Amino acid sequence: MIVDAKGLSEVKPAIVPKIVDESGQEIYGPAFVSREYALQAGMSGYTHTLASAKTDPRIKDNPLIVKGLKTKNLERSVIVDSNSDAAKLRQASEHLSFLRKCSVIIVLE
């Protein structure tokens, strides 16, 4: 999954990033990942362009791309995603597999 957070200058990289929907329900965070994968490569990668995100080794072909809307209050490592993108993620059949493997890249400003 690629989280496009461009335009959200307040987003800061974190060891334990979280993605929530507009109602605050977590759609990606520590509860979704394998401890082994997180220790090996971190919960997510960070980059500055969509092009580099698409070619990152942790991302497979045809990644789900979601757009970050804002950060959650003062928690600048918690990105709020739209409810419609969150629904797409929850409906993806491989949803738990790629999240468990920390196959997430966050594109920053």
Residue ranges and their predicted role:
Residues 1-109:
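Domain-level marker for long, solvent-exposed, non-transmembrane regions
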